[in-house]
């Protein structure tokens, strides 16, 4: 018998709001199953369970805001007798600072929970609309903002449209003030605790670009690759040569990681940033990295990240994409010890064999932790990324 | 398909890959990257969705012709009748 508690999804997280249960008492769960959705400063996060067993009792109601460590459910294992659990004492649960929770329809026997984007959730809550009554058109039947809006047209209009937070084209379901606070807390801690050093290196991309264009020309859109996938793969592979860039710095000092869980900084429309990780990225080929990146971006947009993805990164790659500025000098995401930044690839004057020619190039930067490594090792890292990008077709 | 139907289909696929956008707030001349904040991954996901819906190849060299909803609707209409 054990307790499933509100997980910490980052050093700065103090509480989370239970949005929905994806299990009910009596359900059997396996390690890694997603059992609940919790709304945090980073948006809605799917919570995995890390042991197998049977749900004996749910100890928290959707809508409750609970501190990290608060019991959410009781899990029975095979050896357990019938559970003899006192019901949760409501007075022990801290009162939410927010107004009473929107009525989230309980997960019932009729088809299970309804996936929905955070924006859809928030809009439905504003309107007092049960998500179960809305037909979803998103991936897996997920309810999207447009579905909620369409649903309201069938009903009497509310007297006034509720105010939105964020910009006119922002992400209404996410509390941007809270997200900004979370980013500020993590970045302040980083700048307070981590003695950063920075390196910058220009990398010619004509080899990568040529290979990419030839590869994509023969492929339908859903199998095409982006330069970003090649940049991530080169970074992940280069870590084999400089393992002191990959891991976590805790109270006992630096702990290198055997696997590369590569965080990707994903900017949210309307502001804010999340850096979910691709786990075990060290051996993945370009196609698989691309597929994982697509999946992570899609689920970040739809509000379907898992807690392990946002807590277990061992390094972060931040890429400005194809329309940004030349270079970015990042702030390390603690407890990681390095962040690789890529500016926007751009055609620049390059000297090759003594001849000045225009060519596509990108500025790669490294922000790394001086408690763990020195600039000399950082230079080896960037040089290795460069070398790997000159042979993009290597398996 | 009528131009209106093509535009509606385009907006539906756009919302599918960016569910946090409000369809009512999208203007015909909004630039997908600069105004609506799509990144290269979002854009590729949109191209994939359009490819599936319309069975058009949409090579990379045509990406600039999808820069705004009005340009994209014109491009798709032209390709569908070609």
Model-derived segments and spans:
Chain B
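Two-component histidine kinase catalytic core, primarily the HATPase_c
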Residues: 42
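Conserved alpha-helix in the HATPase_c
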Residues: 45
